[in-house]
């Protein structure tokens, strides 16, 4: 079966869509860490049979060691779940995704890959950004070839012929991995104990939809959330100036309405896509994330309970070793959290 892990700070409607879309796209069970105190979101996720939720906004999960940066919190949380799933027979793959992402894959082909294929790479498809918050999220940009990028530059669509300029979000995609103690989940790609990036199997049927700032309103909401969740997030070089500008603007202590208006100006100048030109060139892919291709398969209730009880016990641990190992230290933490190995839920190690 397929599992996912996410660290989330989003509205209830956004979380509802995030869960529904990923469960309809091949994920069987989702583990969601709530990065802010949101009683309505917590209630919804707690009641969902295909979701395990962790309240991770304060000392109940982190003790006195809550990382300042969102990326670090995501990294810790993903690797806790990865480690716990090395003891779970039901979880064949784990995908680390954000709340604005949807896996886009062929589940049948994925499950036919040989056992020695331990990592898969999901190429990004980025939702076009237009000033229409009600537009259906069905038009996506793919990564372009060098020649296609030169054409876009010549047409004045981008200032520089690079996918890093063309995409507003990440170009690195995401990854899925078979849970193992010597592989560590990253934000985009897994690493080994030496923190070296590990290669993954790629195919046209492996992708991730990124609903990155699909509209002016979404752009304003996203950056307000990100920049009130800790230090300025790490971004690729092509976006550094824009993020610096947004961070500076938010910290000027201007009236909220004025800040939102100026954020909207930044959106118009730097983010809004020339959808008409991209459409005429045939550069857009059509995907409907709400057209469920799969129904989530049910993980046995006893296995879900084991996972959730283990997560509760991990809350009291020092989680540093989960991020980068070594494996024997992670093994000891697992023994402390879930007990020593026994058949069934605790019967596997890779």
Name each model feature, range by range:
Residues 28-37, 54-57:
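Short beta-strand/loop segment that forms part of the nucleotide-sugar
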Residues 40-93:
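Active-site-proximal specificity loops/subdomain of glycosyltransferases
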Residues 28-29, 92, 118:
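Short acidic/polar active-site loop segments enriched in Thr and Asp
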Residues 90-104:
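Short beta-strand-to-loop acidic/aromatic patch adjacent to the donor-nucleotide binding site
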Residues 71, 105-331, 335:
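Catalytic-site signature of metal-activated, phosphate-bearing donor transferases
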Residues 1-23:
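N-proximal low-complexity "stem/linker" segments adjacent to membrane-targeting elements
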């Amino acid at each position: 079966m397929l599992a996912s892990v996410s660290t989330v700070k989003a509205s209830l409607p956004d979380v509802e869509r995030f869960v529904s879309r990923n469960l309809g796209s091949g994920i069987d069970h989702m583990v969601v860490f709530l990065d802010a105190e949101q009683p309505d979101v917590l209630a919804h996720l707690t009641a969902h049979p295909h979701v395990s939720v962790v309240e991770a906004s304060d000392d109940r999960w982190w003790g006195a060691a809550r990382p300042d940066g969102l990326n670090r919190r995501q990294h810790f949380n993903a690797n806790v779940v990865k480690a716990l799933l090395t003891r779970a027979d039901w979880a064949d793959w784990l995908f680390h995704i954000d709340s604005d992402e949807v896996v886009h894959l062929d589940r049948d082909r994925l499950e036919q890959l040989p056992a020695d294929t331990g990592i898969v790479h999901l190429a990004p498809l980025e939702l076009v950004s237009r000033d229409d918050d009600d537009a259906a999220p069905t038009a996506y940009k793919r990564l372009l070839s060098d020649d296609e990028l030169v054409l876009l530059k010549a047409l004045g669509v981008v200032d520089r012929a690079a996918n890093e300029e063309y995409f507003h979000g990440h170009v690195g995609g995401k990854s899925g991995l078979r849970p193992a103690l010597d592989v560590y989940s990253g934000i985009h790609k897994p690493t080994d104990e030496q923190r070296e990036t590990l290669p993954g199997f790629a195919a046209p049927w492996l992708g991730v939809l990124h609903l990155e700032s699909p509209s002016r309103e979404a752009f304003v909401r996203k950056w307000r959330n990100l920049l009130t969740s800790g230090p300025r997030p790490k971004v690729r070089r092509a976006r550094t100036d824009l993020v610096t500008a947004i961070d500076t603007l938010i910290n000027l202590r201007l009236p909220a309405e004025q800040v939102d208006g100026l954020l909207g100006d930044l959106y118009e100048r730097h983010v809004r896509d020339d959808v008409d030109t991209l459409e005429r060139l045939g550069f857009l892919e059509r995907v409907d994330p709400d057209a469920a291709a799969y129904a989530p398969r049910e993980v046995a209730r006893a296995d879900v309970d084991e996972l959730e009880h283990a997560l509760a016990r991990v809350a009291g641990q020092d989680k540093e070793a989960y991020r980068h190992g070594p494996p024997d230290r992670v093994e000891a933490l697992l023994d402390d959290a879930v007990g020593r190995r026994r058949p069934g839920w605790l019967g596997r190690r890779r």
